[in-house]
Amino acid sequence: MSRITKSANGEDCQVRIIGVCKGDPAYTIWSHCRHGAAGKGRGIKSIDVAGAYACTACDAAYDQLQGVPHMSRSEVDLDWFHGHMRSLVILTNKGLI
C-alpha cells in the first residue's frame, strides 16, 4: 500500500455522489481511475496519483458495481473527476505529490 492509498484513512469523501455518498470518513478509501488513459487495464489498477478520496458507496457507483438510477454514467464520471481534482489539492497540501 502506498503513502497515497494509506492517506485515505479518515479523509472525507471527495466524490460526493448525491443520494449515494455515505458522508462518513470511516468509509473513505482511495478510488483508482477506471480509464485506460491512467494506466488501468486487465486487472491492473491505474497509478495512484490518478485517484480520488471516495467512500465505498461512491467508489462502487463509479466502478459500476452499484447503479445510480437518478444519474447518467457521464454524471457519475463527472462527480468522480471533480472528487479527483479536490483530492489532488489535498494530496498537494499533505506533501504527497
Where are these regions (language model features)?
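Short cysteine-rich loop/turn motifs with clustered Cys
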Residues: 1-31, 55
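Histidine-centered nuclease catalytic patch
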Residues: 17-50, 62
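Generic macromolecular interface patches on structured domains
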Residues: 23, 64-68, 93, 97
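Short cysteine/histidine-rich metal-coordination sites, predominantly Zn2+-binding motifs
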Residues: 29-37, 70-81
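Short, surface-exposed, polar/charged, turn-prone segments marking secondary-structure boundaries
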Residues: 40-43, 56-59, 82-84
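Short Fe-S-cluster ligation motifs
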Residues: 44-51, 79-97
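Short Cys/His-centered divalent metal-binding micro-motifs
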Residues: 51-71
